[in-house]
Amino acid sequence: MSTAVTEGIEVTVRSTFRPERSEPGRFLFSYTVRIANQGEVPAQLVSRRWIILDANGEREEVVGDGVVGQQPHLEPGEHFEYTSFCVLKTPHGSMRGTYRMVRDGGQAFDATIAPFPLVVPGTLN
């Protein structure tokens, strides 16, 4: 699990290995993200940037609009939660990134997604 707070936007992520959807050389992980507006000004998530690293040091960058087809607008005190997935070639790695947020007044900033592990249970000492 990881948590980061940037300008009142809290991002918490939990990841889970999905053995039923994995096979040798293809390890599927789901991750659930909770984005909460703990600040005093509404903000909208407009885009995402993920950096995915595997155990071989391979790096993949994923950039796109919104999350799961949405660009959630969060009033103070509101939160948005979604689940997505990632496939690695190795049994462990990590993800991190940012969400581009825009306040109702037009101020844009990047909310940090702190690094979180993607690990097949029993593969690390």
Swiss-Prot record:
Superkingdom as given in the UniProt entry: Bacteria
Stored Gene3D superfamilies: ApaG domain
InterPro entries: ApaG-like, ApaG_domain, ApaG_sf, Uncharacterised_ApaG
PROSITE patterns (alphabetical): APAG
Residue intervals passing through the bilayer: none
Any matching Pfam family: DUF525
Domain ApaG: 3-125
NCBIfam families associated with the record: PRK05461.1
HAMAP family assigned to the protein according to its UniProt record, in alphabetical order: ApaG (MF_00791)
PANTHER family: OS05G0170800 PROTEIN
This protein's name: Protein ApaG
